[in-house]
């Protein structure tokens, strides 16, 4: 095989770019959430969930070791991975009247999407989830 100087140069440049240090996942997530407005967050949450500011993240739901049995265990394990799903607690709603404000100016804790009526779980699977951090939905 015969490589031209341009091919070798292009390959070397591509490897250099691939090896360059990048942002950590936490920094990248912070950049994405810093520019969100309350209206953007509501669009991410959808019409059935409301944007909330939460005080705590429940670490007991942060692990998904796929040790459970049942139909959803394998499906959720494949979707969520080993990081699991972080659920939140101590949440209060962020008003819709401030839709154009930046989200980080309204909430310094964890921003989450919460079920509006919180008391009912209906449907085929009927899983009642409390609040889910918006960072997990981005």
Curated annotation (Swiss-Prot):
GO terms for molecular function: structural constituent of cell wall. The keyword Disulfide bond applies. It is found in: Secreted; Lipid droplet. InterPro entries: Hydrophobin, Hydrophobin_CS. Transmembrane segments: none annotated. Residues 1-19 form the signal peptide. GO terms for cellular component: extracellular region; fungal-type cell wall. Pfam families: Hydrophobin. Disulfide bonds join 45-113, 53-107, 54-91, 114-131. Disruption phenotype: Leads to slightly enhanced mycelial growth, small conidia, slow spore germination and appressoria formation, cell wall integrity and virulence. Reduces the cellular lipids content in both mycelia and conidia. The keyword Disulfide bond applies. Keywords: Conidiation, Disulfide bond, Lipid droplet, Secreted, Signal, Sporulation, Virulence. Interacts with the lipid droplet coating protein Cap20. Aerial growth, conidiation, and dispersal of filamentous fungi in the environment rely upon a capability of their secreting small amphipathic proteins called hydrophobins (HPBs) with low sequence identity. Class I can self-assemble into an outermost layer of rodlet bundles on aerial cell surfaces, conferring cellular hydrophobicity that supports fungal growth, development and dispersal; whereas Class II form highly ordered films at water-air interfaces through intermolecular interactions but contribute nothing to the rodlet structure. Belongs to the fungal hydrophobin family. This is Class I hydrophobin 1. It comes from Colletotrichum siamense (Anthracnose fungus). The lineage of its organism: Eukaryota, Fungi, Dikarya, Ascomycota, Pezizomycotina.
């Amino acid at each position: 095989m015969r490589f031209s100087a341009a091919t070798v140069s292009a390959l070397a440049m591509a490897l250099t770019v691939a090896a360059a240090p990048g942002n950590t996942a936490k920094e990248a997530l912070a950049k994405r959430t810093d520019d969100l407005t309350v209206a953007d967050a509501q669009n991410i949450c959808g019409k059935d969930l409301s944007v909330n500011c939460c005080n705590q993240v429940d670490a007991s739901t942060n692990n998904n070791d796929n040790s459970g049995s049942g139909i959803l265990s394998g499906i959720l394990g494949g979707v969520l991975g080993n990081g699991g799903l972080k659920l939140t607690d101590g949440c209060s709603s962020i008003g819709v009247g401030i839709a154009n404000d930046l989200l980080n100016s309204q909430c310094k804790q964890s921003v989450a999407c919460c079920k509006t009526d919180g008391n009912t779980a209906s449907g085929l699977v009927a899983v009642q989830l409390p609040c889910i951090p918006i960072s997990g939905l981005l």
